[in-house]
Amino acid sequence: ARDMTKQALPAVSEVTKDTLEEFKTADKVVLVAYFAADDKASNETFTSVANGLRDNFLFGATNDAALAKAEGVKQPGLVCTSPSTTARTSSPRPSMRTYPRLRKVASTPLIGEVGPETYAGYMAAGIPLAYIFAETPEEREEFAKELKPLALKHKGEINFATIDAKSFGQHAGNLNLKVGTWPAFAIQRTEKNEKFPTNQEAKITEKEIGKFVDDFLAGKIDPSIKSEPIPESNDGPVTVVVAHNYKDVVIDNDKDVLVEFYAPWCGHCKALAPKYEELGQLYASDELSKLVTIAKVDATLNDVPDEIQGFLPSSLFPLARRMPQSTTLVPHCRGSRPVHRRERLTQASASVGEAVEDATESAKASASSATDSAASAVSEGTETVKSGASVASDSASSAASEATKSVKSAASEVTNSASSAASEASASASSVKDEL
């Protein structure tokens, strides 16, 4: 019945100073536009959005400049309200992008609760998330009340949420907080996976947290970075990466980089380790090590820019001019089209190793053939010596020449095979880049 009533109303209802307050509470999410009557573009955009979303939200509009001023809105402006909060924006010309952003802000609780059902939504919100860790519902309610003025002040800039420290306390470690020391507060810049933990000895009060949040927004606080020491040497087939050299090794270099993000306790990671070392050996030659780096990072001890969704993912970071964005590969996931393409990218990278392995086997066979040929020639030369010194000299010279040609041919095959392997892998990666 409620939906039928909404359908009976116009897509955009006209509001006045007498009806505005009641209209604001008429639905879960209400958008009111304050546009001048002659602002044709803004009015048309608002009406178009309203026609498409009238089943989900309530839309109202007024051309009354005095009412806009009384509401503290500068024309052209939009105000989005819900039972828990109000969000507003003023701009020279609100665009279609304005509306989803306002609806998302207005529909997010002022201080919500982080849990399995809400975590993904907070991560996708596009703004930082402030965590309030506390053990009991009573404590979480108390801190929510204490920090409510800050949540109101920074609505649309930072999401505030409590989190059950008993059930999800281990997540504090991901934010570089000390697990077990409660209550605790930290901000996560979700888009960059940067962490800003507070001093856990300080009290969680509006004053203390307010200053921390203001400094965070002003860029006065550096993110907390957890890192192992940079290795003194990295001579093995697999380069060890830590947080403090991640940018230099993985991002700012002139090579393609394949990175394994692992956890020492992960059984799958342990099973992969010897194979990954073999892969590193395949790329250890002078020819290929100039093009590709095989690397690994302990994701439990090092912060990295990308959030790791479980362990054992590998990420290929191609040279920027070939593919400017990193691609995360999760081998144990199946079914989605993006993952399928990512697996193809992994295969394109792995084809280098396979081709090099083929080239190596070919080289061994060619070298063996060359050795046999040389031995046979020397044997024939020896027999010839027995029959005549002059003929022996010519035969030995001819044998040495043939052996040299055979070895050169084998070396040429190795070089061509490796070059072809690198060329095919580069072309394959380029093809996948075009699809992505």
UniProtKB/Swiss-Prot annotation:
Enzyme class: isomerase
Cellular localization per UniProt: Endoplasmic reticulum lumen
Motif Prevents secretion from ER positions after renumbering to this chain: 433-436
PROSITE patterns on file: ER_TARGET (PS00014), THIOREDOXIN_1 (PS00194), THIOREDOXIN_2 (PS51352)
Main location: endoplasmic reticulum
Region Disordered, residue ranges: 328-436
GO biological process assignments: protein folding; response to endoplasmic reticulum stress
Superkingdom, natural source: Eukaryota
Composition bias, Basic residues: 334-343
Protein name: Protein disulfide-isomerase
Compositional bias annotation for Low complexity: 362-377, 385-436
CC terms in the record's Gene Ontology section: endoplasmic reticulum lumen
Active site location: 266 (nucleophile), 269 (nucleophile)
GO MF annotation, one: protein disulfide isomerase activity
Site residues, Contributes to redox potential value: 267-268
Keyword annotations of the record: Allergen, Disulfide bond, Endoplasmic reticulum, Isomerase, Redox-active center
Family the UniProt entry places it in: Belongs to the protein disulfide isomerase family.
Pfam family, one: Thioredoxin
Disulfide pattern: 266-269
Catalytic activity: Catalyzes the rearrangement of -S-S- bonds in proteins
Enzyme Commission number: 5.3.4.1
